[in-house]
């Protein structure tokens, strides 16, 4: 009697399984907020619309840092409207920094991918399906939105702020040579474990934090894909970029140059 031979397929790596079984993936959006009462309902509605139309499994985690304008009250209402399985409010008592906001949010995230973005409508959720497609095409560890590549751009800024932004990006390219076109942007998709590792390594605060994340990613040989995005100045509220932030950015840039 001929023996029966059972062929066994080789064990697939986690990354192969993620690429071949996209419906099993879940995307956790981290939304740090401070005085975003007017913007929050619209950005959440746009996120829900984009994910629902694309058939993407998601959750939105709102990390409010003690906003005095009632942002937390709005977030509580959104949690009731969309359900606590989709909208998770995880507030803190005061402003404690962007990096710690991400750490706090990730503690509650159940997705295997993390999306970070601004809550002020500067980043449109319509680009998220493109981020996900890009990640799958190249099996990237990180996908970053870029204002400085392809048809990406900035809208609503005056000439002064455009010059500051371009100048800052030019300096970072010259000094750090990161291999990515937009270091100061904050619209990105990460594998959850990659973001956890990067936050462990990063020491910067404020606007330099996002820049260091990309620099450290290159040091750790993580792969980075880019998607051109349109960045639009905030619809409601005042910009949080001022003179102190610019000085802090320059100090942080020089520190990274000296230590990386």
From Swiss-Prot:
GO terms for biological process: dolichol metabolic process; dolichol phosphate mannose biosynthetic process; dolichol-linked oligosaccharide biosynthetic process; GDP-mannose metabolic process; GPI anchor biosynthetic process; protein mannosylation; protein N-linked glycosylation via asparagine; protein O-linked mannosylation. It comes from the Eukaryota. Its main location: endoplasmic reticulum. Pfam families: Glycos_transf_2. GDP-alpha-D-mannose binds at residues 32, 34, 36, 63, 65, 118-120, 147, 234, 240. Mn(2+) binds at residue 120. This is Dolichol-phosphate mannosyltransferase subunit 1. It comes from Homo sapiens. The lineage of its organism: Eukaryota, Metazoa, Chordata, Craniata, Vertebrata.
